[in-house]
Each structure stands twice: as structure tokens, then as C-alpha cells.
Amino acid sequence: MSRLLLNCDIGESFGNWTLGLDAEVMPFIDCANIACGFHAGDPGIMRKTVALALANGVRIGAHPAYQDLAGFGRRSMSYSPEEIQDLLHYQVGALDGICRAQGGRVEYVKPHGAMYNDMMAKPAQLRAVIQAVAAYDPQLPLMLMATRDNSAAQALGDEYGVTLWFEAFADRAYDNAGHLVSRQLPGAVHHDAQTILQQALTIARGEPLAASDGSALLLHANTLCVHGDNASSVAAVQRIREALNQQSGL
């Protein structure tokens, strides 16, 4: 990727319950991480979200999770490597089928919530996720968190021939190791649109952020995430899009 891509977790409503402002966000993003039914989403929501992404020319990514609808996929759970691969294949395959029925396709994979965090904390789980992507389609990139040092993850991706897209967050606070501050702690999520915009621009320029302890943190990222369930992020997303386009000369 030659420029920083803007991605958003999206399609996270289900049944009569609505979350996020998908239609408002979609025109300004490059990549839509669409929930696949295990933490949020359902077949109808998936179909509608795919149609919205295709209408806006947005790349579609599968956003698989632990099977935890009640906990929104944010609770860590114990799975074997084989079970992790089963979860991924089931969810990616479901979204891919819905995409193909509308003339689209899944273009990358980004795990959600606790699956994402556990993947970053446990090398064996990261290996299982990369193996699952490679087995399903080795041409699909895997989106994962950019940290102070991406080299270990990159080596695993290279081992299985899977492209890695390293992701930074515009609306989350970081600790000094380059990990996201737990949502259980105060200040973990930025709720001011100007703060979100400034963090996005800092990352896009390749400049160091201020970690939660005040230390400088430099992240090497390919893509930037904003959350569609954070009203402040939605308020900032158009300004972020305009700033990224200006930086890229678009």
C-alpha cells in the first residue's frame, strides 16, 4: 500500500438492535471491517453492509470474533489453534459468500476484540490466525496491530506467505509498549474529535505519539482505524479523510 488506508469496524448491528452510523461513515473510508455474526451482525445486516460498501467503492474485510454475542466479542476465551482456525473459516466463508452473491469479495481479514488482542499477546494464537488465513486464501492480507516492533509478526507472515497490514488507531490511547490501553481504564478511548484528528495526523506523518505515560511512541502503520460506534470518531472521520487526501496529493 502506498498510502495510509482508513478503515472502520462496521456492520455491528443485529436484529432490532442498531449500533454505529454505517451509512454516515462509509463514504469516507477505504476499508470496511464487517462483522460476521459471532460478536455482532446477522445475515441481513451483513448483506446490507456489503451492499453499502460496494456502492461506495470500499474494500470489504471480514471481521471475525470469538463466539460471544452477549459480550460483543470483547471477552477473552480459551480456544485451541484448531478451534481458532474453525472460527475464522466459518465466519470469513459466510461473509465471502454474501459478498460473492452481490458481485464482490472479501479482500482482507481483521479479527475483532478479544480475538485481536489475544492474537497480539500470544504468539501461538497469532500463528493459528495466520495459518487460517493462509489455508483459506493466502492472497488475503491480515490486519493486525502496529506496535513498537513489528518484526516478529512480520516473520510469521513471511513464513506462511501472508501479507500483513499493520494498523494504528486514531481514537484509542496506547501504553509505552505500543499496546492499546485497556477499555477498563479511564482515558482508553478518545472522545474528543480534535484529539482523534490530531492523533490520526501524527500517525499519518510518521511522527511519534505520546503514550499514556508521556513517553514517545513511534508506530509504523499501513492503515488507520476509527470506530463506527464512537460518536466522536464519526464526527472526525470526514476531517481525517480530507487530511489524508491532502497528504497524498489527492
From Swiss-Prot:
The keyword Hydrolase applies. It is an enzyme of class 3 (hydrolase). InterPro entries: Glyco_hydro/deAcase_b/a-brl, LamB/YcsF/PxpA-like. It catalyses: 5-oxo-L-proline + ATP + 2 H2O = L-glutamate + ADP + phosphate + H(+). Pfam families: LamB_YcsF (PF03746). The keyword Flavoprotein does not apply. Its EC number is 3.5.2.9. SUPFAM superfamilies: Glycoside hydrolase/deacetylase (SSF88713). One of its GO terms (molecular function) is ATP binding. Gene3D superfamilies: Glycoside hydrolase/deacetylase (3.20.20.370). GO terms for biological process: carbohydrate metabolic process. Keywords: ATP-binding, Hydrolase, Nucleotide-binding. Belongs to the LamB/PxpA family. Catalyzes the cleavage of 5-oxoproline to form L-glutamate coupled to the hydrolysis of ATP to ADP and inorganic phosphate. Forms a complex composed of PxpA, PxpB and PxpC. PANTHER family: 5-OXOPROLINASE SUBUNIT A, UNCHARACTERIZED PROTEIN YBGL-RELATED. HAMAP family: PxpA. This is 5-oxoprolinase subunit A.
